[in-house]
């Protein structure tokens, strides 16, 4: 969806019949008015091109709804496997300067892609698995495989400039130069010009900082001088290497860059506690805007990484605006952890117009009494815990007040691989409104629970509103604890849930139930009204080779998804058997069954041969099914 200021949320709301009273209740913080393009989700000035919709060369569409399949983390449950020297091609529907590629490569490996425009190579990206691939076992997340670990965080992203301007109608090709490669989608963006140094400012360059070099001391000194002289700190174009956590302490400081595509603070340490901004609890009226933050962090350190892009209390009326935050423990964890007599609360924080992606844990968590704060008009994608959360925590020794009146509005939240799209854990008077939550298959779309210690919902007298959200293809059959989670999930463990109002939400193609719960919902606890779901179309599945219908009970992990179209009021989906891409070689061993040779393969996106004499099938594998090809039987197995 492209950014068009002429289409406002007000117009969209009028078309869809949303009342003025509904819109007036979408925020309770003082912040500038944003005109929204859509009823659901954030504005975005980029256009997405799904790899499955592209022209494929030596590449295959991979589709599955199996819980542990790589496809489970892909947009719309499908991606494209591109063989070496294979490619995908598409036509740009509008002009662009930059692109973002979402990809997967095997754990411990690298790959390389070339980008061509109208057949001419203009860009090369080196792809690396090092920030990705975590293994989840209940509460624990590991950096390497475990016996009961579920592989997750298998997709990552890379972005950069084409080096040329891409015009509408140009042909864009992504070619795999080396290694194993899966492509989920490509996003093209018309990038605005870099922002110039503002008035009454000092530049990081004035302190000797240079792009590509360590700038830690320069940044610390520049922050000190900006605070003392009441100047804005401007960070010009470039990637500045930072090898330590940066402390911010004081009122009224503004740090701004040339734009999220131009200015990057790259934290170079992979050690716990050595990256991000740590906000001192006497700070107020802080502004961080128009730059990106990235890091070398690759581990949660058993939930002790202490490596968040932003951590601490931001005091009163602070703002995080137009930042691109990637590869941290969390995007922002907001809360003070001082002793009870010295607690300072975040009040009136605005996080907006930002991209918070591919972090190991939460996107944003408003904790420790944070109030009157809002996250809005942001894209939160590919994170490894709740994408957006408000937790009424009471850390040891703090006696923290309750979180209250926080707002999550008009965010696009997608592809979370663990926990909820949005999580509300206690508190009062919050609003969750007009968000688009899509492909959140690590947990519920929106979860409301008392599973964690802290304030529950006992003080929630005025109610928490969950209105006008759309939840698409979200929920899970297994939350890593053996429980299914619906588009909405309610879990009562350490206190009652009360005064929650779900109204005018839309659920599309939920993975499991619309609502899952561990207690009976009443109007006093959760009032549900005027919610709809849009997944009632009949679906017919067709084998592309035989043109015969496939039973709904068939194991669809034995097939590649080849697209769909709507016909006579139903959706027709096309599937190609995995056996069609398997080539039987003379050296392959086999057994016999009723005069037919039986060959064994793994049930991966790209099946691997399993030799009869070296494989302990019943001990190490689970039988998935079989298909016939050229008079032979291809038997598929998945590793236990």
Predicted regions located by residue number:
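Sec-dependent N-terminal signal peptides of Gram-positive bacterial secreted proteins and lipoproteins
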Residues: 2-26
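Acidic Gly/Asp/Thr-rich repetitive segments characteristic of extracellular carbohydrate-active
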Residues: 204-236
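Extracytoplasmic
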Residues: 32-200, 556-562, 566, 593
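Right-handed parallel beta-helix
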Residues: 258-261, 284-295, 316-329, 344-361, ...
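Non-cytosolic beta-sheet module surface loops
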Residues: 92-94, 103-107, 176-178, 226, ...
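Extracellular beta-strand-rich, repetitive "passenger/adhesive" scaffolds
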Residues: 85, 177, 230-239, 257-263, ...
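Short glycine/acidic-rich loop motifs that flank beta-strands on beta-rich extracellular proteins
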Residues: 231, 243-245, 260, 264-275, ...
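Extracellular beta-strand-rich solenoid/capping regions of secreted or surface-exposed proteins
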Residues: 220, 225, 241-255, 264-290, ...
């Amino acid at each position: 969806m492209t950014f068009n200021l002429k289409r406002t949320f007000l117009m969209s709301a009028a078309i869809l019949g949303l009342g003025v009273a509904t819109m007036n209740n979408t925020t309770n913080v003082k912040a500038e008015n944003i005109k929204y393009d859509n009823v659901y989700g954030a504005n975005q000035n980029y256009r997405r091109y799904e790899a499955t919709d592209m022209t494929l060369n030596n590449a295959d569409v991979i589709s599955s709804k199996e819980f542990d399949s790589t496809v489970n983390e892909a947009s719309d449950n499908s991606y494209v496997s591109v063989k070496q020297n294979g490619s995908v091609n598409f036509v740009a529907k509008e002009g662009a300067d930059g692109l973002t590629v979402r990809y997967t490569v095997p754990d411990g490996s690298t790959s390389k892609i070339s980008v061509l425009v109208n057949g001419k190579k203009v860009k090369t990206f080196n792809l690396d698995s090092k920030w990705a691939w975590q293994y989840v076992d209940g509460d624990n997340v590991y950096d390497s495989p475990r016996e009961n670990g579920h592989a997750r965080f298998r997709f990552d992203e890379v972005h950069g400039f084409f080096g040329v301007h891409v015009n509408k109608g140009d042909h864009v090709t992504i070619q795999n130069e080396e290694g194993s490669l899966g492509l989920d989608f490509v996003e093209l963006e018309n990038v605005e010009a870099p922002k110039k140094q503002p008035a009454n400012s000092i530049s990081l360059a004035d302190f000797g900082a240079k792009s590509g070099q360590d700038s830690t001391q320069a940044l610390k000194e520049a922050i000190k001088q900006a605070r003392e002289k009441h100047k804005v700190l401007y960070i010009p174009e470039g990637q500045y290497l930072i090898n330590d956590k940066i402390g911010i302490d004081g009122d009224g400081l503004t740090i701004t860059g040339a734009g999220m595509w131009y200015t990057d603070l790259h934290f170079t340490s992979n050690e716990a506690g050595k990256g991000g901004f740590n906000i001192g609890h006497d700070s107020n009226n802080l502004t961080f805007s128009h730059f990106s933050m990235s890091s070398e962090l690759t581990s949660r350190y058993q939930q002790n990484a202490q490596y968040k892009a932003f951590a601490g209390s931001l005091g009163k009326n602070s703002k995080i605006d137009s930042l691109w935050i990637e590869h941290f423990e969390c995007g922002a964890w907001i809360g003070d952890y001082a002793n009870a007599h010295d607690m300072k609360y975040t009040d009136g924080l605005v996080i907006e117009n930002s991209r918070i992606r591919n972090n190991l844990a939460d996107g944003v968590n408003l904790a420790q009494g944070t109030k009157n704060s809002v996250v809005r008009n942001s894209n939160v994608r590919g994170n490894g815990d709740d994408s957006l959360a408000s937790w009424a925590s009471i850390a040891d020794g703090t006696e923290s007040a309750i979180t209250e009146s926080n707002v999550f509005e008009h965010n696009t939240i997608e592809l979370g691989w663990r926990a909820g799209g949005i999580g509300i854990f206690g508190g009062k008077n919050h609003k969750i409104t007009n968000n688009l939550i899509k492909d959140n298959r690590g947990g519920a779309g929106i979860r409301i629970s008392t599973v964690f210690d802290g304030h529950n919902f006992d003080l929630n007298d005025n109610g928490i509103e969950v209105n006008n959200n759309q939840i698409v293809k979200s929920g899970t059959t297994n939350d890593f604890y053996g429980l299914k989670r619906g588009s909405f999930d309610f879990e009562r463990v350490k206190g009652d849930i009360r005064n929650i109002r779900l109204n005018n939400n839309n659920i599309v193609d939920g993975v499991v139930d619309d609502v899952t719960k561990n207690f009976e919902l009443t109007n006093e606890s959760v009032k549900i009204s005027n919610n709809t779901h849009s997944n009632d179309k009949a679906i017919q599945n067709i084998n592309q080779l035989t043109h015969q219908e496939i039973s709904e009970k068939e194991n669809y992990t034995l097939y590649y998804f080849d697209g769909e179209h709507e016909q006579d009021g139903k959706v027709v989906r096309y599937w190609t058997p995995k056996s069609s891409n398997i080539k039987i070689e003379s050296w392959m061993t086999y057994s016999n069954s009723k005069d037919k040779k039986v060959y064994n393969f793994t049930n991966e996106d790209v099946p691997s041969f399993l030799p009869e004499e070296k494989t302990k099938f019943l001990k190490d594998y689970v039988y998935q099914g079989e298909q016939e090809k050229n008079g032979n039987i291809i038997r598929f197995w998945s590793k236990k």
